[in-house]
Amino acid sequence: MAANFWNSSHYKQLLDPEEVDVVHDLDKERGISIDDFKLIKFHMSNHIMKLAQHIKVRQRVVATAITYMRRVYIRKSMVEFEPRLVALTCLYLASKAEESIVQARNLVFYIKRLYPDEYNKYELKDILGMEMKVLEALDYYLVVFHPYRSLSEFLQDAALNDVNMNQITWGIVNDTYKMDLILVHPPYRIALACIYIASVHREKDITAWFEDLHEDMNLVKNIAMEILDFYENYRTITEEKVNSAFSKLALKL
């Protein structure tokens, strides 16, 4: 629960859930529904994660890149800002913001190896050209706070920092970036929700520890339910649904 989060641009940009689930008019004209909108962002989050594994950047860079991508689509339509190019550009920008710089040409090289049919038309100049547009869409606010630091501190404080709990909670936090939680909730509260889910799964009673935090558990449990709902809905995601969503943007997969 870093003290300077509350004075940060990240805190000031937190949104209400209904502000996040808004399809822009240009996208609506293409028939994009709210489910399509979420599905495309989910798909691009996976692309960023997979590409990051190949270029070997820290998880924080991945999380920042996905946050940038999701912030862009609060203000810009997918018709205006092509999702694949935005995803690539956000990873490039995040690597610089997090001081773990990746060469743009390496991004182009690896993404074409991973997804040759989807990214064959993109070159170095496209990423560099989109970079300024993304920066403008972000209002040049590049600072992002993540749940990871709070997660480690909470696990240690609750005496839950064994290897298994670390792996489970870290994995859940990673999965939250396939959703818009980071745009809506303070990162420390997302961390608490992930610990809550893991503690129930592992049958660890940490009720007293949560009570000592004097945190609103209704808020924590609501986030936990959002995560669990995502896991349930994740099972129904098919390649056919992804293709259908992208086809409405006239983006051939």
Swiss-Prot record:
Keywords: Cell cycle, Cell division, Cyclin. GO terms for molecular function: cyclin-dependent protein serine/threonine kinase regulator activity. It comes from the Eukaryota. One of its GO terms (biological process) is cell division. SMART domains: CYCLIN (SM00385). InterPro entries: Cyclin-like_dom, Cyclin-like_sf, Cyclin/Ssn8, Cyclin_N. The keyword Cell division applies. Belongs to the cyclin family. Cyclin C subfamily. This is Cyclin-C1-1. It comes from Arabidopsis thaliana.
